[in-house]
């Protein structure tokens, strides 16, 4: 399963925000420069994360971004679902975006031989992503504040 550049950049931006948690706001240009993220793309990512309730922002010369929640309360799964949408390998096993497989000969049956395996794949991916928090990555970077839950 491959994640998008949007998720990759979003996670890298959140590493910067995690390192600044409990400190001064960080400006998007600083995030862009430190993480080599194109500023136009970063603006879209930060807006999506803000709209999802993970970030706060302040406009103006002393403005910038900050995490609303502590980094030990934000999982990779949350971030990736916000930026990329559901991670199910096929739509008929998605928890959040379930769709019947329209062209599948088993769609109207009670059992699909593929669905069970794909459900296991979905659950394994979710288990990994939902059990790793931003604070773990900040710790590996040697960053983060004492309040970050490290």
PLM features per residue range, with description:
Residues 26-36:
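A short alpha-helical element within helix-turn-helix/winged-helix DNA-binding domains
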Residues 68-150:
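Non-DNA-binding regulatory cores of transcription-related proteins
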Residues 17, 45-50:
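Basic amphipathic alpha-helical segments that dock to polyanions
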Residues 51-54, 82:
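Residue cluster at the C-terminal edge of the helix-turn-helix DNA-binding motif
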Residues 53-68:
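Beta-hairpin "wing" of winged helix-turn-helix
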Residues 40:
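Key DNA-contact positions within bacterial/archaeal DNA-binding proteins
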Residues 19-22, 33, 51:
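The C-terminal cap of the DNA-recognition helix in HTH/winged-HTH DNA-binding domains
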Residues 10-22:
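Short amphipathic alpha-helical interface segments
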